[in-house]
Amino acid sequence: GQPLALFNVWDAGSARTAADAGAVALATGSWSVAAANGFVDGEQMPRALLMEVLERITRATDLPVTVDLESGYGERPEDVAETIALSIEAGAVGCNLEDSFPATGELRDVEEAAARLAAARRAADRAGADYFINARTDVFFKAPADTHDERLLDETLARARAYAAAGADGLFVPGLQSPALIRALTAASPLPVNVMR
C-alpha cells in the first residue's frame, strides 16, 4: 500500500507550517518537543508540560496528531494508563510507546513492555477513543548498524507478536535501515510497520 508520511512537529507554529505544506497527519518527536522547551530527551520534560504543548498542537490545526510518549512516564503500567488518558484529553489520536527505559536506554523484558502496552490499550478503551498505539521497539536502534541481522529481526518479530497480543496497533522500528530486513519484517509482522528515515 501507500505509506503514510508523518510530519514531526514540536509546537503549534510548526504544526501549522506542516499543515500548510500539505501534511495529512502530524506527530510529535520527544527529542524536538523537549529541546524546544529547554529539556533533554528521556522523560526529563514534565508530563504536565508535555500535555500543555500537545493540547496547543492539537488545537492549531484540524489534522490528527499522534504523540511521542517515550516509555509512558512512570514505572508502573498504571502510570502509563494515566498518561494515555491525559493525552486523549489533550486531543491526541494515538501515541508511540517505547520498550526501553528512559534513564538507561536498556530494553525492557518483553513481558513488562507488553504489560505497559496492555494498560495503555485498556485506558484508551475506557475513554472510548479510537486511539492508535504504535509500539516502538529499540532492538535495532540500540545495536550498531554492522550487527543488524536475522537474529535482531527474530527478536523484533517476537516483540511484535507480544505487542500485538497486548493491543498495539502498529510497530515502530527506529534504526532499521536495511531494505532487505525491512521487507522481511513487513512480510512477517502481525502489525503494520513504521520506520524512520
How should these model regions be labeled?
Residues 1-195:
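Alpha/beta enzyme core
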